[in-house]
Amino acid sequence: VSVDAADPGRGDVGGITAAASLRASRATTLRTAHDQVTAAIAEASPEVWTGQSREAFIVGATALAAELSTLAGQADAEASALSTYAQGVQSIKDEQARLELRRADATADLALYKRQKRTADIEATTDMAIGASTDAQERSATYADWIAQSEADLAAVDAAWQDLVSDRE
């Protein structure tokens, strides 16, 4: 199954959870049937029922009880696997939402710092031409640092996003 790199959290957690619940319910039903068959075996005492038909019933019912127990175990295992998978998908969805917010914040910060740096660069050029203070140059250098930090934040978000994609694969 390929993972959509643009949406690593894609999946219906509710649907997966519902499928897990259905299998857990099926396991309960199978265990109830197992208990009923086991009770029927116990009730088929030699005092009540004798002969070959009783023996055939005991053999068949015992085999049925074993099969019901096996099927209940399989349904429980499927329910557990689906529940674990649903939790994993939800965890990825939650992390994806956090990363999307971090990306949006870093992108907005980057755009703001670039605009502010351009303004500071223009002011610094003017200030240098007239021999004024170096405040604008210092602001430009500060914005350059903030731009680098925002770009590093975006790179970290991209790396974490790729980790999500890998986790889902």
Go through each PLM region and give its residues:
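N-terminal secretion-targeting helices of virulence/extracellular proteins
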Residues: V1-D167
